[in-house]
């Protein structure tokens, strides 16, 4: 039985799942909004929120931690130079999720995730 097993697996093993989360986080940071399934949006939201909280204090150590999580220098630069300064005085809640209907092919619930402000 799978009782009390937290987390979504998305039909992937560990490394492909981590790569999925990394790619979704990089896409959200670079484009500042994206459309994906509701489950993926809910999963990526706390990851991105933690990265923004980390980036609010711009130090070499925090940049290296963000680089280890994202693996994309453009995303790290945009996170620290563009996105994080907007949220310096805000204690959290940097992203929001809107439900936008269902996907035509399989009926999966879709969502728009974007940065606030």
UniProtKB/Swiss-Prot annotation:
Q: Name one GO biological process term.
A: translation
Query: Which key words tag this protein in UniProt?
Result: Ribonucleoprotein, Ribosomal protein
Gene Ontology cellular component annotations, sorted alphabetically: cytosolic large ribosomal subunit
- Annotated InterPro entries: Ribosomal_bL17 (IPR000456), Ribosomal_bL17_sf (IPR036373)
Q: Which is an annotated Pfam family here? A: Ribosomal_L17
- One GO molecular function term? structural constituent of ribosome
The family assignment reads: Belongs to the bacterial ribosomal protein bL17 family.
Subunit architecture: Part of the 50S ribosomal subunit. Contacts protein L32.
Q: Which NCBIfam families match?
A: L17
Name this protein carries in UniProt: Large ribosomal subunit protein bL17
Q: What is the lineage of its organism?
A: Bacteria, Pseudomonadati, Thermomicrobiota, Thermomicrobia, Thermomicrobiales
């Amino acid at each position: 039985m799978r009782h009390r097993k937290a987390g979504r697996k998305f039909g992937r093993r560990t490394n492909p799942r981590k790569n999925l989360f990394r790619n979704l986080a990089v896409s959200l940071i670079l484009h500042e909004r994206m459309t994906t399934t509701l489950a993926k949006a809910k999963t990526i939201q706390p990851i991105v929120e933690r990265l923004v909280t980390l980036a609010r204090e711009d130090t070499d150590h925090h940049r290296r931690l963000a680089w280890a999580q994202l693996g994309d220098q453009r995303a790290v630069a945009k996170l620290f130079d563009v996105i994080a300064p907007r949220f310096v005085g805000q204690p959290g809640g940097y992203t929001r999720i809107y439900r936008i209907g269902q996907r035509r092919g399989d009926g999966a619930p879709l969502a728009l995730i974007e940065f606030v402000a």
